[in-house]
Amino acid sequence: MQHGNLKTPVLSIVDDDESVREAIKGFIQSIGFKAEMFQSAQNFLVSDILKQTSCLIVDVHMPVMTGLELQSRLTSWRCRIPIIFITAHDDPAARAQALKAGAVDFLRKPFTEDDLLRAIQVALDPVGDSYRPATCTLIGKQF
């Protein structure tokens, strides 16, 4: 699927729950986008997909590196990727932190496909530069 003169956006899903990853991937593909899945923030950070990602859907609470820590890492690398957070926990402090740091949305599980679609549409707003892959300064960075 082409969007104007730009390639089909790649949406990356980072969640330690495989069933959540699979469900979101199926939905993303059903609306015509490419989807890549990662079981951890670390796997996403070392993947070649990072530089192709137009939108990141990430769980807040994961082992080793949380979604908020991933957001902070990407910010420190100057990666401009729109982020949609998802969580099963009612955590107003995490929500406030994520949105203050520039997250597109913060969805509480279970959320509807319409909720996710609206967040994706905001993240991929063609008025901005969101359909373009991420831009990052990664040289010399470690996680």
What are these regions (language model features)?
Residues 121-136:
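The C-terminal output helix
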Residues 93, 111-121:
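C-terminal output helix
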Residues 18-36, 123:
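Two-component/phosphorelay signaling modules centered on CheY-like receiver
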Residues 37-55:
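Acidic, metal-coordinating helix/loop segments flanking the phosphotransfer/catalytic sites
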Residues 62:
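Receiver (REC) domain active-site loop signature in two-component systems and cognate sites
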